[in-house]
């Protein structure tokens, strides 16, 4: 019989598991991250490209990640290269854009761009076709609000953007 004297209290705080988002029913998926907000996006990319094959309408995925400098871009560079490599044998086109927001110049490297991402350009490009686009943003509130405003503006122009976001604050 267990003793009640040796109790251990455990507190778990989430989220845990996978995001319950039905992005597989969209032709175009745009994933936008700021800083450590890349974490759930890596999970989504792995599910799309390395997970169990399931029925999907996805034709293209654009992943945009903004970090201050080259150091932070290395956090998940191995995963990015791996996902990009396996996407080449997929019918789904993967485009990866990593923005070094404080960099004036960018060292030579796969996926790297200097300055803040031009979300207007990226979201407008993803919604060129009449097919609905799924937009997921995870990052600081300012980034999420900016992407939301652009998506709303595009919706007013008749483009369809289904928007989901996660924010973090410290």
Which residue ranges define each predicted feature?
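Reductase modules of NAD(P)H-dependent flavoproteins
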Residues: 1-22, 57-170
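Generic hydrophobic alpha-helical scaffold/packing signal
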Residues: 17, 30, 42-49, 80, ...
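Beta1/beta-strand and adjacent pyrophosphate-binding region of the FAD-binding site
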Residues: 27-34
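Classical protein tyrosine phosphatase
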Residues: 34-64
């Amino acid at each position: 019989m267990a003793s009640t004297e040796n109790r251990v209290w455990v507190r778990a705080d989430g989220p845990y598991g996978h995001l319950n988002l039905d992005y597989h029913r969209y032709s175009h998926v745009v994933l936008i991250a700021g800083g450590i907000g890349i974490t759930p996006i890596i999970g989504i990319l792995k599910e799309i490209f390395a997970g169990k094959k399931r029925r999907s309408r996805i034709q293209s995925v654009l992943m945009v990640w903004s970090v201050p400098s080259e150091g932070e871009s290395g956090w998940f560079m191995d995963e990015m290269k791996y996902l990009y490599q396996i996407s080449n044998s997929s019918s789904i086109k993967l485009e990866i854009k990593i923005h070094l927001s404080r960099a004036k110049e960018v060292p030579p490297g796969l996926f790297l761009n200097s300055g803040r991402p031009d979300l207007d350009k990226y979201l407008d490009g993803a919604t060129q076709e009449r097919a609905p686009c799924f937009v997921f943003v995870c990052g600081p509130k300012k980034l999420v609000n900016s992407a939301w405003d652009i998506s709303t503006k595009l919706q007013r122009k008749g483009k369809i953007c289904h928007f989901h976001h996660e924010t973090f604050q410290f």
